[in-house]
Amino acid sequence: MSTPAKELCRLGLREAGAGVAAKAISSTELVEASLARIQATDGKLGAFLAVCADRARAAAKAADARAARGERRSELDGVPVAVKDLFVTKGVPTTAGSRILEGYLPPYDATVVERLEAAGAVIVGKLNMDEFAMGSSNENSAYKPCHNPWDLSRTPGGSSGGSAASVAAGQVHASLGTDTGGSIREPAAFCGVVGVKPTYGRVSRYGVVAFASSLDQVGPLAREVGDAALVLRTIAGHDPRDMTSSTRPVDDYLGPLEEGARGLRVGVPREWLSGGLDAGVEAAIRAALDTYRRLGATLVDVSLPHSKYGIGAYYLIAPAEASSNLARYDGVRYGLRAEGAKGLKEMYAESREQGLGAEPKRRIMLGTYALSSGYYDAYYLRAQKVRTLIRRDFDEAFRGCDVIAGPVTPSVAFALGERTGDPLQMYLADIFTITCNLAALPGLSVPCGLEAASGLPVGLQLVGRPFDEATLFRAARALERELGPLPAPPEP
């Protein structure tokens, strides 16, 4: 008797892969269940910008053939996943959530896409996002908003909103997103899934549409800590096509996963719990910290004194880099081209006017101003100095602890439309996540319960030393094992 499609969709990533390997279920069954789930739910969720049904079915058929021969590429072989529409995919539209790339068909795959497919994972589609990854609510998508599976009137977070919503809703077993200032961890927290921002340089950015090149990083989202660890192990490692890619060997993330929290020193920054948090979020975070103490970890008071300047530094550095990266979208080589322009300069201007949304334009203006003659030293250079101080704060804190723990966001998922008219309020959603990017450190969001008042998920943020993702996974798994999984969100 076959397993109902809905049950297949709620299987963990490793559980689904093991089922394919044991021939208890087929990759074709998993993929058809995923496609049916997307068809049934995405009209309300809006998590997908493109569904690659034919490509996915062909990949599933190949995975089943390998299973029949007793071959297995990896634990991911035959399992449906999806990727943010920021990763180029050969022959599949890649828009970065922007009109200016509407209809663009890349001639090659991003490195992380190559690595997923080499491991046998089946990519079923491309996921919704804020335009060029600029946003914290997925409302900046040029195509449609994405909704939170826990409450369709609320944001899933951004910019990787589709990546989190698709996993939480059981459309796929895992996904990839990008994180420039919190864009994996915030949606993961809002949607009640695990989201990982690796150390800068741990995962190749080749084939990822650039936002802020010194901050962008690729990472996984999944419903279980171990599943996220497996995906990261699959995509991590040196890539000669990305000059920022580290040559450091990839650690075994799964080996220490079940070692527990006993003996861990968990740093708690006093600046992160000193105000500005909604009461329900603070209660959930403090309860999670108490759980670590109960499990044998030692809570250590640490200070990150320059973290209060993180928002200001980030919103100078990131727009400055974006203003350069987005200069290539001019209507000449690919994407939207304005018709009827009387000359080259007018065509440039009209193509960008028609193709770019309000948030990219705002950040291009901010970045161009910060880099302009007479203002570079006062703004951009000073922001980079603050970045150095933030990195030193973390170095000092890690002298006395193994991981740092605190909130991901000041609140649970907020209502769609609530902050679109106030960019500053939107930017403040990233207040706890931005410093991790500025310091190039690994960070992770793991569910730590539901807020009592709203019943919405709360995420605990864990930050680690450079390239010590293994300790983050160990600490996150200890909490996950003790608290148990969150219930599935309501049916859309």
Curated annotation (Swiss-Prot):
GO molecular-function terms, A-Z: ATP binding; glutaminyl-tRNA synthase (glutamine-hydrolyzing) activity
Organism of origin: Anaeromyxobacter dehalogenans (strain 2CP-C)
Subunit and partners: Heterotrimer of A, B and C subunits.
Stated role: Allows the formation of correctly charged Gln-tRNA(Gln) through the transamidation of misacylated Glu-tRNA(Gln) in organisms which lack glutaminyl-tRNA synthetase. The reaction takes place in the presence of glutamine and ATP through an activated gamma-phospho-Glu-tRNA(Gln).
PROSITE patterns: AMIDASES
Name of the protein this chain belongs to: Glutamyl-tRNA(Gln) amidotransferase subunit A
Gene coding for it: gatA
GO biological process per UniProt: translation
Alphabetized PANTHER family for the sequence: GLUTAMYL-TRNA(GLN) AMIDOTRANSFERASE SUBUNIT A, TRANSAMIDASE
Catalytic activity: L-glutamyl-tRNA(Gln) + L-glutamine + ATP + H2O = L-glutaminyl-tRNA(Gln) + L-glutamate + ADP + phosphate + H(+)
GO cellular component, one term: glutamyl-tRNA(Gln) amidotransferase complex
Matches recorded under Pfam families: Amidase
EC class of the enzyme, as a word: ligase
Gene3D superfamilies: Amidase signature (AS) domain
Entry keyword set: ATP-binding, Ligase, Nucleotide-binding, Protein biosynthesis
Keyword Protein biosynthesis: yes
NCBIfam families recorded: gatA
